[in-house]
């Protein structure tokens, strides 16, 4: 009898706990509904974060959020406690230094060696301190100096040789330029991180580097599953390993880590690299030697973060730049005419100072940045205080992010927003340029603007100038489109960009 009573009592407690849990869920959901009832958005987004996560898993989150903005307006609730904005004033306030809004927990996905690089630093003051250590290194006046620019120019010429070899091999003048661009961006990034003496040699034929880069792109396609469903991702990894009898398919991130640590050891063990070369490793080592309390883990995390971000951003941006010029022969010819008028340095490439001021090239690249942003747009911030943007009140601790796609395609700012039209930049008055630039955030905005912007522009403009000084390009299939996945680095679907090359006459 006591046993029966005990079982009955335990069952009653279990039922009560279940009911209390359900009641808590109902109360919390009701509170959230009431708290954000004034912010429009899909009904499913109001009650669960799983709806927007579904589009994340489908690699369509940024595109879907931009679609919701077209439907609901500049403020959209995309999940309980999460709001997306496409209002320019609100965006600038959200990311301003004065707001001091920390980054969200999403950036915990970018921890390396249990340390936070600048990109993953959530708190405003922590980010400001770390950024202050290296910001001068990334300034245009620094990266445009000969010791960084000349090795990059040499790699431009190496990339052109690769393209020529592929043209001959194909027999039809068709080349997939994306892997070549990726190798070029990787070699440039590793040179900036470790110094030219210890950079990678993907352009020169290092198959290990090339294989690693290809696997990193495939690995990123699974990023949303890894971040949102880690147990499922572990199961998929195990199943693939058993089926293929190899762990190589999902080992790219671990292999990159090992590669980076080996290269770090070689760099720090080489007295010449610490004395004669400017690099991120050399900079941080110098700070440590002068008393800055920077741990080994921080140095390692900064290295890996720069390797990921540097090569991925330039690969996507440059691939889309040549894609748009190939798809728009009129603007390609305008760029070529402009390039023909520029003086050349000893290596045959245009003088950088004048190239960087070439207005038509600048306008074309800006249009490419606008139409195809180089990142996912998940620049999430946690509101440090209750905030009001016009008539919209958003409470403290809400996760807020700006939709880059929605801002870049806003028909109230951009006439025929989906059209590649560099003329909008070339014919605009100074006041109109300022108005366009307020809605133009390819490298972010505010206190956390991308540090590598100047180095990225150097790589992109030099590569474009080299191609179109010598060749005409067209799409392999005329009129084809090259859409983007909604991955962290906004990779092109298919991971390729096949162009038809023809030597200029």
From Swiss-Prot:
Q: Which organism is it from?
A: Gibberella zeae (strain ATCC MYA-4620 / CBS 123657 / FGSC 9075 / NRRL 31084 / PH-1)
Matching PANTHER family: CYTOCHROME P450, P450, PUTATIVE (EUROFUNG)-RELATED
The transmembrane residues are none
Listed binding positions for heme are: 450
Q: Name one Pfam family in it.
A: p450
From the UniProt annotation, give the residues forming the signal peptide.
Answer: 1-23
Known glycosylation sites: 188, 351
Q: What happens when the gene is disrupted?
A: Produces significantly smaller lesions and fewer spikelets with blight symptoms on susceptible wheat cultivars.
This molecule's function is given as: Cytochrome P450 monooxygenase; part of the Fg3_54/C64 gene cluster that mediates the biosynthesis of the octapeptide fusaoctaxin A, a virulence factor that is required for cell-to-cell invasiveness of plant host. The 2 nonribosomal peptide synthetases NRPS9 and NRPS5 form an assembly line which likely utilizes GABA as a starter unit (loaded on the unique module M1 of NRPS9) and sequentially incorporates seven extender units composed of the residues L-Ala, L-allo-Ile, L-Ser, L-Val, L-Ser, L-Leu and L-Leu, respectively.
Asked if the Swiss-Prot or TrEMBL record annotates the protein with the keyword Iron, the reply is yes
Q: Does the keyword Transmembrane apply?
A: no
- Cofactors named for this entry: heme
Gene induction: Expression is positively regulated by the cluster-specific transcription factor FGM4 and is induced during infection of coleoptiles of wheat seedlings. The fusaoctaxin A gene cluster is silenced by H3K27 trimethylation by the histone methyltransferase KMT6.
Its family remark reads: Belongs to the cytochrome P450 family.
Record key words, sorted: Glycoprotein, Heme, Iron, Metal-binding, Monooxygenase, Oxidoreductase, Signal
Q: Name one GO molecular function term.
A: heme binding
Q: Which pathway is this protein assigned to?
A: Secondary metabolite biosynthesis
**Per its UniProt record, what InterPro entries does this chain match?**
Cyt_P450 (IPR001128), Cyt_P450_CS (IPR017972), Cyt_P450_E_grp-I (IPR002401), Cyt_P450_sf (IPR036396), Cytochrome_P450_monoxygenase (IPR050121)
- Write the Enzyme Commission number(s) for this entry: 1.-.-.-
Q: What protein name does the entry list?
A: Cytochrome P450 monooxygenase FGM1
